[in-house]
A protein has these predicted regions:
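Active-site SXXK
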Residues: 41-54
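Residues embedded in well-ordered beta-strands
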Residues: 12, 25-29, 183, 241, ...
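Charge-rich, well-structured scaffold segments of protease-associated domains
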Residues: 6, 59-214, 249, 278-424
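Short N-terminal binding/cap micro-motifs at the start of the first secondary-structure element
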Residues: 13, 23, 36-38, 411
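Short pre-active-site segment immediately N-terminal to the catalytic Zn-binding motif
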Residues: 30-40
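His/Glu-based metal-binding/catalytic segments typifying zinc-dependent metallopeptidases
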Residues: 16-32, 210-275, 423-424
């Protein structure tokens, strides 16, 4: 049974019993990420420097320790968090916790190593600034949610990142790696009491109490008005993100039904494929995706097309929505139920998946979603419920459009015309 274990001063341990193997998957770190970095990339650079030596081990010694004691070790930074993650055998888990703890708590951020690592991150920023999909997604989010913090990219601005000092790194840890922001997510065959003991021993007991980060991107609400942003770039293709509002994660029934609707519309030879590929050959690729949080979210058409077919794609979206609003056939309902059973039978659950799932459940819902909640939801997969979900989602009152590639805004139909076409 997954559980949330509250530790001292608000530190959080998320635990799931691993019944599949004797391995332990864990994520440890802080609920403080790039959204609050003011586009400096400080959190991300901090993550990189965790591997560059501590007060106890030099860079070379730490590298050797990691090589000898970890089968899998990495770290990651998002807008909301910075964590170390690993997947280890039962025999090595204490040593894995010990080394991870030293990396978090005692990294020196050596000045010479810091300057070297900045060059590594600089290359990441250059690649990201050349990634048309990433640019279109970023522009969509900051327009649709209209929160200033979203403008802060996790990698940061190159010039600002290059100016970060050792002193800033140390202060970042001092201010943010506190008990109130600490989180650990663990899937292990070891009992919860043992994992709790290790987390306290190697992490929480060494942290001070401090100021809790109250910023939560999962609480964002959608902008009240439609919008469109176009970024002209010299590329071979155009990327379009055309989004409409959809419900967030808190309503489990609605969220589950929406996932079934997406399975129906986006399948091979389904309505989405039919309108964009079979009938008119409009796109290089097409998908219908979700981007949701606790309260609000987006359902967006993820399109790659050519410059001359951008406007035609809006008409295809209109035709697609008109078709699906006619309702789902009973044979497709039966197919969805059959597919659900097949997926359920195939799923075993890797400890790494459980570990990450626990953390995302906690961030998205503020709690852990139990397996039986999803199993109970299967009974809601009926034609009546699916039709109601389709009508709710595909009758939007606003639309958000992000376009990037070899196209100018003046060549795209006006937003007001797109609104009349798709919203009515």
């Amino acid at each position: 049974m997954p559980k949330i274990i509250k530790l001292k001063d608000g530190a959080i341990l998320l635990y799931h019993k691993n019944t599949q193997s004797k391995a332990t998957a864990f994520r440890v770190g802080m609920l403080r990420g790039g959204y609050l970095d003011k586009n400096t990339g400080l959190s991300h650079l901090f993550e990189h420097m965790l591997f560059k030596g501590t007060t106890n081990w030099s860079n070379e010694e730490l590298t050797a320790l990691i090589r000898d004691n970890f089968s899998n070790l990495n770290a990651s930074t998002s807008g909301d968090y910075m964590i170390i993650r690993s997947y280890e055998s039962k025999k090595k888990i204490k040593q894995a916790f010990k080394i991870s703890s030293d990396m978090l708590l005692n990294s020196t951020f050596d000045k010479e190593e810091l300057e070297k690592e900045k060059q590594v991150v600089r290359q990441e920023i250059i690649r990201a600034n050349d990634d048309i999909q990433r640019i279109a997604s970023h522009n969509l989010n900051i327009m649709a949610y209209n929160y200033p913090e979203l403008k802060s990219k996790t990698l940061g601005d190159e010039k600002k990142m290059m100016a970060i000092t050792q002193k800033q790194m140390l202060k970042h840890r001092e201010d943010n790696l506190v008990r109130e922001n600490f989180i650990a997510s663990v899937c292990s065959n070891l009992p919860a009491c043992t994992i709790k003991k290790y987390i306290n021993e190697y992490f929480v007991n060494h942290l001070k109490s401090g100021k809790k980060n109250t910023f939560d991107s999962c609480n964002f609400t959608i902008n009240g008005k439609s919008g469109m942003v176009v970024e002209t770039m010299d590329r071979q293709k155009v990327v379009m993100k055309v989004a409409i509002p959809c419900n967030g994660y808190l309503d489990m029934k609605k969220s589950f039904l929406l996932s079934r609707v997406l399975s129906y519309t986006s399948g091979v030879k389904g309505p989405l494929f039919d309108h964009f590929r079979e009938k008119k050959q409009l796109v290089y690729s097409i998908a219908l995706r979700r981007n949701t949080n606790k309260h609000d979210g987006l359902l967006f058409f993820d399109i790659e097309t050519s410059t001359d077919k951008v406007n035609e794609c809006f008409y295809a979206i209109k035709d697609f929505m008109d078709e699906v609003k006619q309702g789902i056939a009973q044979k497709d309902v039966a197919r969805l139920l059959e597919k659900y059973e097949e997926n359920d039978d195939r799923f075993v659950g890797h400890p790494v998946d459980f570990c990450s799932g626990l953390m995302f459940d906690y961030l998205d819902y503020g709690r852990i979603v139990k397996d039986k909640e999803f199993k109970r939801l299967k009974k809601y997969v009926t034609k009546e419920n699916l039709d109601a979900t389709i009508l709710e989602v595909f009758n939007p009152d606003k639309i958000f459009i992000s376009v990037a590639g070899p196209v100018n805004k003046k060549d795209i139909m006006p937003l007001s015309k797109i609104e009349r076409l798709i919203i009515g």
